[in-house]
Curated annotation (Swiss-Prot):
Disordered, as annotated region: 89-116
Source organism per UniProt: Fusarium vanettenii (strain ATCC MYA-4622 / CBS 123669 / FGSC 9596 / NRRL 45880 / 77-13-4) (Fusarium solani subsp. pisi)
Highest classification ranks of the organism: Eukaryota, Fungi, Dikarya, Ascomycota, Pezizomycotina
Similarity section: Belongs to the complex I LYR family. MZM1 subfamily.
UniProt keyword Mitochondrion present: yes
Name the UniProt record assigns to this protein: Mitochondrial zinc maintenance protein 1, mitochondrial
C-alpha cells in the first residue's frame, strides 16, 4: 500500500471506531482487531488495489463516524433506547420526508412510466 495515504486512512478508521464505539470496550476492541487484520492482509497489494483499498477505508471511517450511533435500553421489558448521538453524527433535514406526500412527483408509475 502507499505508505502515507494508507497510514492516514488507518488512523482515520481507528479514530472513527473510537468515536462510534465510545464506552463499549468489547465492540471497540473487536473493531480495532478487525481494522488491524484488514490492513495487514492488504499490506502487499499493488498500487491500483492500494488506492481502492485506501478509498474504501476512508468511506468506512466516514460511515462509522457519521452514521453509527449506540443505543442503550432504558428500561427492562420496554423497547425504548437512549441513543448516544455525538457531534459527528449526521443529522438530516428530513426534506425528502416532508416533500414525499406533497404530490410533487416527477415520474409516475413504475420505473418512471405513466402508470398505465
Amino acid at each position: 500500500m502507499a505508505t502515507v495515504p494508507a497510514l492516514n486512512a488507518y488512523r482515520h478508521l481507528m479514530r472513527a471506531a473510537r468515536i462510534a464505539f465510545q464506552g463499549d470496550t468489547q465492540i471497540l476492541s473487536a473493531a480495532q482487531v478487525q481494522i488491524r487484520n484488514e490492513f495487514r492482509q492488504k499490506a502487499s497489494i499493488d498500487s491500483t488495489g492500494a488506492s481502492a483499498a485506501i478509498q474504501h477505508a476512508e468511506e468506512v471511517a466516514k460511515v462509522l463516524r457519521e452514521n453509527v450511533v449506540q443505543g442503550k435500553k432504558t428500561e427492562e421489558g420496554k423497547d425504548t433506547y437512549k441513543l448516544r448521538i455525538h457531534e459527528h453524527t449526521e443529522r438530516g433535514d428530513n426534506e425528502s420526508i416532508l416533500t414525499a406526500g406533497s404530490g410533487n412527483t416527477t415520474g409516475g408509475g413504475c420505473c418512471g412510466g405513466g402508470g398505465r
